[in-house]
Amino acid sequence: MISVVGGVYEERCKYPAWNQIYGSGLRAAIAVSSVSDTVSLHAYVPEEWTKDVELTLASFGVNGDLHASKHPMSFEYLHSFVRVDPPEQQPSLYPALSVESDVVLRFGMMESDARVKGDRVVYDPQAPDASYYCNGSNAGSLAMIVSGWELPGTRAELLKRRSEDRQESLMPNEDTLLKAIINLRDLPHPPQIVLVKDGLGGLIVFQGDQPVSVPSYAAESFFRIGAGDVTAAAFAHAWGELNLDPVDAAHYAARCTAYFVEGPRLPLPSVAGVSDRKPNTIRRERIRIVGLGDFELDALAHTTQGWLSYLGGDVSYVKFGLEGLASNGQDDIDLLLVGSRCSMKEFEAAARADLQPTVIFWPSAEAFAAQFYFPDAVVASDYATALYHVMRSSKQ
């Protein structure tokens, strides 16, 4: 049995098109409904969504402890790396939810808090410097799962980087990360396990003296919205309910994340159902980008350089257009960005230039044609999927 405490929110994304009611709480409860005997969701739900949410929970066999709220909240995305507008802040918080269960997965929420008690608890604060115990929550064993910059003490370093106009990064550097873990362990009630998400489906597990890296696992596509929720849910099931070792549970969570992002697909398979997933090797080679198309591709090419650097990639050069590529001896391209209005004539010119792109991003209905000209390339019409494949090692 597992109890999930978390938000239910609307999610809207332009690329890829997505308009659904999920949020961390609802997504996680659905995720584990196939592998857990009993799942309960404890959440605030806007009155106009209550009937739909109840029907959704019933279809997956999830028990709902739903509390009415009056303010629907929506997360807006341009694409899955860019959240356009955060939800409006609530005028006041609703009363804290109170949950007690053997196994609890607790998410941070926008509209309220949750006071929980459990034998094994997984806490995903979804905010920097959050404390599990400050509201009276208790746990026999506590696992905390966070993004790197959510660790206590990292906020100051992040603000410093921004003030110096340095390149944004998904993860703190190793020194900052280790200092944050040490500071966390010095708290009066530290978590026994800390898992840091790497943004591509992998994890770093801190338990004992040595951190253990758990790789991301291979996926054909990469639907990023909600991937962290699925990671937390899968780990909570494997560690909390199945009593797996934390590292083994983290491997299961990473495999489940790869399963989810290929769809998105819910609910999740069992441990045996994802055992054949192959691990990724994160790219260490330098990345080469070429943009092909209209003026906006020049801007997209440089923006993409920033995103790949954010994900930990090392971009060696960015080129707009085909001129001079052969003379520079740089025909092997890691990412070819093709404009949505790029003509087949321009694309055929790229093929005649004998480029050998590893990944092609082409947000066009004609994207399938790219496979004819570049049969060995991964062709993606989704931006996050293209970046994901670029970040996988070319030597795999």
Identify the meaning behind each predicted range.
Residues D65-A68, P375-A386:
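Short acidic-hydrophobic, aromatic-tinged amphipathic segments that line or gate anion-handling sites
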Residues I2-V5, Y9-N19, A31-R120, R277-I287:
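Conserved N-terminal subdomain of the carbohydrate kinase-like
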Residues V82-V103, G108, A127-S131, L308-D331, ...:
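A short, well-structured beta->alpha microelement
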Residues I21, L26, A218-T281:
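Conserved post-catalytic alpha-helical subdomain immediately downstream of the catalytic base
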